[in-house]
């Protein structure tokens, strides 16, 4: 399999597993944070060295490639199950934070209603 095809498949896999984390915070383009920017789609010649691969994947400075290359390298040996577990943990944390915000808003509304009820009682 040519390296370009390998990286294309790897990119798809990482994007699918990482979900929201596969969107670069700097440029908002899906796929960057998994270490595989869209530039890789244009690669048709297999690269022989890691440096060649790096240049094919990150041909432009504005793609914040160094950061994403390091992230990709750090994820390279992580199993799919581990990535799925991380994704589920992030989803749980997001849901918990959302629930806590709603709970706080409800507490504030209850306190406001309680205050209004006290004022109404004092007028009677």
Swiss-Prot record:
Query: Would you say which domain of life the source belongs to?
Result: Viruses
**Region (C-2): which ranges?**
30-68
Q: Where in the cell is it found?
A: Host chloroplast envelope; Host endoplasmic reticulum; Host cell junction, Host plasmodesma
Q: Does the keyword Zinc apply?
A: yes
The Gene Ontology biological process annotation of the record reads: symbiont-mediated suppression of host innate immune response
Q: Which residues carry this modification: Phosphoserine?
A: 79
Q: Which UniProt keywords apply?
A: Coiled coil, Host cell junction, Host endoplasmic reticulum, Host-virus interaction, Inhibition of host innate immune response by virus, Metal-binding, Phosphoprotein, Suppressor of RNA silencing, Viral immunoevasion, Zinc
Q: How is it modified after translation?
A: Phosphorylated at Ser-79 by a host PKA-like kinase; the phosphorylation at this site seems to suppress host cell death.
Q: Does the keyword Coiled coil apply?
A: yes
| One Pfam family it belongs to | Viral_P18
Look up the coiled coil feature and give its residue ranges: 72-124
Q: Where is this region: Basic motif (BM)?
A: 1-14
Family membership: Belongs to the virgaviridae suppressor of RNA silencing family.
What is said about its interaction partners and assembly? Answer: Homooligomer.
Instruction: Give the domain note.
Output: The domains BM and C2 are involved in zinc-binding. Zinc-binding of each of the motifs is critical for the biological activity. The coiled coil domain is probably involved in homooligomerization.
Q: Can you say what this protein is called?
A: Suppressor of RNA silencing
Organism equals Peanut clump virus (isolate 87/TGTA2)
């Amino acid at each position: 399999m040519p390296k370009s095809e390998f990286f294309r498949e790897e990119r798809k896999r990482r994007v699918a597993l990482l979900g929201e984390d596969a969107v670069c915070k700097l440029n908002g383009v899906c796929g960057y944070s998994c270490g595989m920017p869209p530039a890789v789609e244009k690669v048709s010649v297999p690269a022989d060295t890691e440096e060649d691969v790096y240049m094919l994947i990150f041909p432009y400075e504005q793609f914040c490639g160094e950061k994403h290359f390091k992230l990709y390298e750090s994820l390279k040996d992580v199993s799919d199950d581990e990535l799925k577990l991380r994704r589920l943990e992030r989803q749980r944390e997001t849901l918990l934070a959302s629930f806590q915000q709603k709970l706080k808003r409800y507490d504030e509304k209850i306190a406001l209603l309680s205050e209004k009820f006290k004022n109404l009682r004092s007028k009677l």
